[in-house]
Structures are given as structure tokens and as C-alpha cells.
Amino acid sequence: MTYDFTSLMDRHDLDAIAVDLPGTPGFSITAPKEGFDVIPMWVADMNFPTVPTIPAAIVERTAHTAYGYFAPRAEYFDAIIRWHREHNGVEGLESRHIGYANGVLGGVVAAANVLCSRGDNILVHSPTYVGFTHALGDIGYNLVHSELKLDEQGIWRMDFADMEKKIVENKIHCAVFCSPHNPCGRVWEKWEIEQAMELYKKHDVFVISDEIWSDLILEGYKHIPTQSVSEDAKMRTVAMYAPSKTFNLAGLVGSYSIVYNSWLKDRMDKEIALSHTNAMNVLSMYALIGAYKPEGTVWLEELREVLTGNVNFACDYIEKHFEGVTVSKPQGTYMLFVDCSSWCEKHGKTMDDVLAACYDVGVAVQDGRHFHGACHMRMNLASPLSRIQEAFDRLDKYVFNA
């Protein structure tokens, strides 16, 4: 490989909540017992160094020691347009369709504010990304959950009949669509997106499509942009993207929307501006330009190979060694949504017991109940394989087969 995905990074005391927050007073993930270090498997960032073109772009810009007011450079828009054309086959994207937001959730909230009034019902799929729950629910929107169903092959599927029932009964005119899905890792097929968008068209539902994970597709699968499935989908969808998940840039904060509907785009721009806190950071602009270079594509291809290997290892290990623990193998993202229901029932344990045992040995997973998983945990696999192997060895010895 051209890039290093095997060395262990020491992120302690370097502004990484993934490793520094566990064990702090009041935080749900407690400190491990003596003899164990923390393996960060909860928050969705990576324990890999990013592609070198990003720090190079930032360093080059910081060498010019004036950081005053600025407007986004043409290179910024050109990089986004080129990336979507080369990676997703998108044609016709222009700079006028691209808007800035301080984080994808900020863009989701802005779009909801444009399309809804506080107190309105918004459709989401369950399991539900906890960020939607807080960003929308905490400011007065009512989230209506349509549960995803596992088919006979163990693949998460949308329940279109339930979606329509919920839309009609709750007078819904806005839906949040997560593609790929977090936490389940589903990469939706074209026919699934088409059917969902036809349903939304039928009932005049606008769509906010969170596609921040769209670059992190595992081998054998392909991301289909929501706006690409029909002309109507193109015009009724606000799509949110960012280089942050792809290139481990969450701390730099810099996301963007793609909106083709000029009526909707104008209102999005106004809503974003009204906060007076949503201006682009000059260094995040250069980070995106650095990320979306050809080197970024090579780095991403290698990362996807590593993540595919990690997912294969983890899912195989669970199937062979953890009786009563199940997982639907993700097709994208680097997260597992692990179901411990049968194991807990057989052993007379609760999810609290499982999490406490994990934390005792430093396996810092995330409580899946925050995502509407009754007896689940969400597990981050974006670390060197040796670290993933160590985590599963601890789970084997001290948690599920203790």
C-alpha cells in the first residue's frame, strides 16, 4: 500500500475525545481496570492518519500569515464538482448548487427549518442516528420512526408500507434519509431509493438526505446519490456531504449541501446566514481542496480495502465465537450495529452488564440504545487490524465467553 494503515497512532492529549473522554467524571464510558488501555470504538472518527495532501494544503495556507475575511475560492467548488463526477457519476453539478454548512447536522437543521415549523412531524428510519434525535428532537421537531426490517438474508430493508402509513397518519411533509445508513451500514440499492422517492413524491414529502458516509462504501457495493434517481428526486432533496467522515476531519468542521431546486437553495442560504455563526473557515476550505486531490482518491481506495478487511474479520469472529450475538454485515461506513439480545436472554444479563464488562477491559463501544437498538452496541472498526483483533480477543475472554 502507498499509505500507512497499520501503525498505531497515539492520540492522547491531542484533542481526541475518542481516547480522552472515556473515564472522565460523568461520562457513560467508564475507565478500564488496571492493566487495560482504551481501544476507542465509540465515536465515529478514525484512528488513521489522514492523506498527506490535507496537512500540506493547510500548512501552505498558514505560511501566509494573514487570515482575514475571505470568499470561497473557485478551486473549492471545482474540487467538489470533480469529486462527485469522478466518484458518483454526477453530471450537471455547478457551483450555484453548492452551499456551506458548519457540519452536516447544521445543514439538516437548516433544511428542516426551511421545510417545517417547530412541532411538525419528520419521518426518520429506525434504528436512528442519535445526531438526528438530538439536533431535531431537542429543538421541537417530532421524529416519527419507521423501523427498518431484517430480511431472510439478514439485510436491513425499508418497510415502504409502514413508511406510507406513518406519512399519512402523521401528516408528514419532510423526511430525513440516511444514505448510507448509520448505524446499520446499509448501502441502498437504486430500486430502493427510487421506491422511497416515488412514495415521497406521492405525498409531497421533501427529503433531507444525509450522505456524509457516501465515500465509505465497502468492496462490492456502490453509492447511489439520492438526487440521481429521478428529476423529481433531484428537485425535492437537500443532500448533505462532507469530507470529514472520509478523511477524518471532523475537528476542522466543514460540510456542504447540494441543492438543485433554486427556490429551496435560496431559502437554505438565507436560513444558514441567519445564525451569523455558520461562516466557512479558511483552513477547512483548504482541507477540502487537499482532500479531493487525486492522492485523496488513492488513499480512499486503500482505506476502503482496509475497512472491508476489518469488517470481514469482525463479522466472521462474531459468528464463530459469540453465540447469541448477531450483526447484519455492513455494506458501507465503518460501524457495526451489534445485537446482543439473544446472548443477554440466555445468560440473564442486561445491556448495562454487557457495556460495563466491555468498559472494564477498555473496549470502548457505544450504547446502541441511543440509536433505538433495544439491546445493541455500535462498534467503530476504523483502526489498524491489530487493534481490532485485540478488542475482539478481550471481548472473547472477558465479556461473551468469560
Question: Where are these predicted regions, by residue range?
Answer:
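Short strand-turn motif at the edge of the Rossmann-like AdoMet-binding core
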Residues: 211-213, 242-243
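N-terminal small-domain helix-loop-helix segment of the aminotransferase-like
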Residues: 2-103, 110, 294, 402
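PLP-dependent enzyme catalytic core of the Aspartate aminotransferase-like
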Residues: 233, 346-350, 356-366, 370-402
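Conserved PLP-binding catalytic core of the aspartate aminotransferase-like
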Residues: 307-308, 321-360, 377, 385
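Conserved core of the PLP fold type I
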Residues: 67-199, 215-219, 223-228, 232, ...
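PLP-dependent aminotransferase class I/II
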Residues: 236-320, 326-330
